[in-house]
């Protein structure tokens, strides 16, 4: 296992500033996410995954809650992420995110080169 970070002259391929955040339970990695922070304006959480045996037990909620606390402490004001249709209700109703407007998504893509994936809804939360 490892954490890789690669800077590139191509903006869409620049992985500088990416971090891996994880939640462990008794030495076992349970939930992980990739995080990229753009100064104090915005942080992006494009990928989150939980081991199958630990799904539907609040592990993602715990990871995101702790991540939000850390981001607030360093002055980050907004967290954005792409939500797949099946999990959109979790992100919005349960975790307090809101779907972004198309113009907000376009603006964010231009300013910060955030990742969005086909078939997902970009969501944001003010911290």
Pin down the residues of each PLM region.
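A short, internal acetyl-CoA/4′-phosphopantetheine-binding micro-motif in the GNAT/acyltransferase core
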Residues: 48-56
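Terminal substrate-recognition subdomain of acyl/acetyltransferases
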Residues: 1-30, 36-42, 69-127
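Conserved acetyl-CoA-binding loop-helix of GNAT-fold acetyltransferases
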Residues: 56-69
């Amino acid at each position: 296992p490892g954490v890789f970070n690669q800077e590139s002259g191509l903006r869409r391929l620049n992985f500088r500033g990416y971090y891996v955040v994880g939640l462990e339970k008794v030495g076992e990695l349970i939930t992980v996410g990739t995080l990229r922070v753009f100064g104090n304006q915005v942080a992006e959480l494009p990928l989150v995954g939980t081991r199958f045996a630990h799904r539907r037990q609040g592990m993602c909620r715990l990871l995101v809650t702790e991540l939000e606390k850390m981001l607030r402490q360093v002055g980050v004001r907004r967290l954005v992420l792409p939500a797949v249709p099946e999990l959109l209700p979790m992100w919005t109703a349960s975790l307090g995110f809101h779907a972004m407007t198309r113009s907000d998504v376009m603006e964010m893509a231009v300013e910060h080169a955030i990742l969005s994936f086909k078939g997902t809804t970009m969501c944001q939360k003010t911290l």
